Amino acid sequence: MTHWITLLAVEEVAKEGGLFDLDATLPLMAIQFLLLALVLNATLYKPLGKAIDGRNEYVRNNQLEAQERLSKAEKLAEAYEQELAGARRQAQTIIADAQAEAQKIAAEKVAAAQKEAQAQREQAAGEIEQQKQQALASLEQQVDALSRQILEKLLGADLVKQR
């Protein structure tokens, strides 16, 4: 029963004032709200805003530094690629020069070997010709000697010596 009495009393109070009463409580509530807003602004919103601004500045600085580093890295990579390409061209030039030099040396050695072989062939041919001439001269002497011996045996030694 006491519940019903309390409920009826609350309904009576609510019917009188409506949403809120326009008495001294309204300006007091407004002052309390403004004080709460000032206190929250000083203790919560300003430090939180500073922290957020600091974080934004930190992120922005990190992004700028990262972009600068990326730009430097790209420039270094490009310079490295150019240097590498130059080194490759230089290496190809050195290899081509070395191959040309090796071919030149090989051609010179082949020509020298052919010249030496030709000289040895000519020397051998000369020696063969000389030995041939010596053999022919020796053979002629032997033929003359044998012919004389045959003539001496056939005709006699006295007739052959007279000739």
Swiss-Prot record:
Cellular localisation: Cellular thylakoid membrane
Transmembrane regions: 28-45
Domain of life of the source: Bacteria
A Pfam family it matches: ATP-synt_B
GO molecular function: proton-transporting ATP synthase activity, rotational mechanism; proton-transporting ATPase activity, rotational mechanism
InterPro entries: ATP_synth_b, ATP_synth_B-like_membr_sf, ATP_synth_b/b'su_bac/chlpt, ATP_synthase_B_chain
Oligomer status and interactors: F-type ATPases have 2 components, F(1) - the catalytic core - and F(0) - the membrane proton channel. F(1) has five subunits: alpha(3), beta(3), gamma(1), delta(1), epsilon(1). F(0) has four main subunits: a(1), b(1), b'(1) and c(10-14). The alpha and beta chains form an alternating ring which encloses part of the gamma chain. F(1) is attached to F(0) by a central stalk formed by the gamma and epsilon chains, while a peripheral stalk is formed by the delta, b and b' chains.
Function: F(1)F(0) ATP synthase produces ATP from ADP in the presence of a proton or sodium gradient. F-type ATPases consist of two structural domains, F(1) containing the extramembraneous catalytic core and F(0) containing the membrane proton channel, linked together by a central stalk and a peripheral stalk. During catalysis, ATP synthesis in the catalytic domain of F(1) is coupled via a rotary mechanism of the central stalk subunits to proton translocation.
Family, similarity comment: Belongs to the ATPase B chain family.
Protein name: ATP synthase subunit b'
Gene transcribed to yield this protein: atpF2
